[in-house]
């Protein structure tokens, strides 16, 4: 696997212990890792401003993306082998140096944005889009769930065309991006970051997760 994009959910970023565990796993993986953070509590502030100041959906969309960058900076302090990247060219250059690229997504999305500018779009779709732009082998969405549940069990693999909504697992536009660009997306429990080692190596993983493909 040459390029792995990992989106770290905002809820996971609240815990220093969880961040440390994820960082330790990522630091030990082979080169080619790109991290996209969630907006978390900072995106919640934008939601509040959206209501109180009556800003437009477009304005809120880009403000929320800018809010993600606060977590980017925070993560860069936790990963010494990382570098903050605000362009696709910087990401590629950082990966060629064997470092972890932590994305500052605002400028990238401003320049190449095919996403609807609304609250229906979250950092999930932004991470998947960045993965598409980089030609990533896999995009992993680290969440606080084991994967997508169907009839009470985590589904190992799911076709994007077989479902219309991802509900609480990810924003629904992720499905559209998977269908349109044939990108592979895995939903993984961020409390079990060791799963990443199996995904990168291609070995059978004993832990549950869901791989969504076109």
What are the residue ranges of the model-derived segments?
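C-terminal catalytic "cap/lid" subdomain
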Residues: 1-214
